[in-house]
Amino acid sequence: MKKCYALLIVLVAMTFTFTFPLSLPAADYKAEYKLSTVVAKPMPWGIAGERWAELVKEKTAGRINIKVYPGVSLVGGDQTKEYTAIRQGAIDMAIGSTINWSPQIKELNLFSMPFLMPDYKAIDALTRGDVGKELWKILESKDTVPLAWGENGFRELSNSKKPVRKPDDLKGLKIRVVGSPLFLDTFTALGANPTQMSWA
């Protein structure tokens, strides 16, 4: 199976490592590479995708052109299908999310475990240490080449009905969750009424 290049964003600062094989002859490059982002352009991931595409074009003297497709538009707005589309070659690379890829790569559910990490320092230690390396090996075994970890902040809870200060405040509250069974289970256990909806 063809290797896919993916940029995996875990949890807004991004550090990119350029790893395309620059020694390939021009004939081996596609006219355009498709970069999927889960969110729209004005969001940090969208802005980062656009900037990265510009830098790649600049650093390769125009040999590599990347077009950014925001809002998981290449998979009809369903972020849970992004990883499958990468594996099938419909998407060349992505600024993706472990939440969205966890239905296909169960080990990525680690980052969706409620209250697992107390702060950014702990999550950075996890992704930069042995656990992060092991997760990269798992991704590589599935023909995906991760380039960097990034962060999107800790899970937050917001709604338009009432303040949520303690778990009991969630009882009966209708709340949108991403397409991860773990999120559905977590919010159900907390007494909420979760509904799966895409970000896009």
Regions found by a protein language model. Give the residues of each.
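Short, polar/charged alpha-helical segment
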Residues: P42-K67, L182-D185
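N-terminal glycine-rich cofactor-binding segment that shapes the pocket for flavin-like pterin cofactors
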Residues: A31, S73-D78, I91-I95
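Positively charged n-region of N-terminal signal peptides that target proteins for export
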Residues: M1-C4
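Short helix-initiation/N-cap motifs at beta->coil->alpha
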Residues: Y69-T84, G179-L182, P194-A200
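Bacterial N-terminal signal peptides
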Residues: L8-F20
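Extracytoplasmic "Venus flytrap"
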Residues: K34-R51, G71-G76
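Contiguous mixed-secondary-structure segments that line small-molecule binding/active-site clefts
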Residues: E54, R87, D92, S97-M197
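Immediate post-signal peptide segment of exported/extracytoplasmic ligand-binding proteins
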Residues: S23-T37, I47, K57-N65, E140, ...
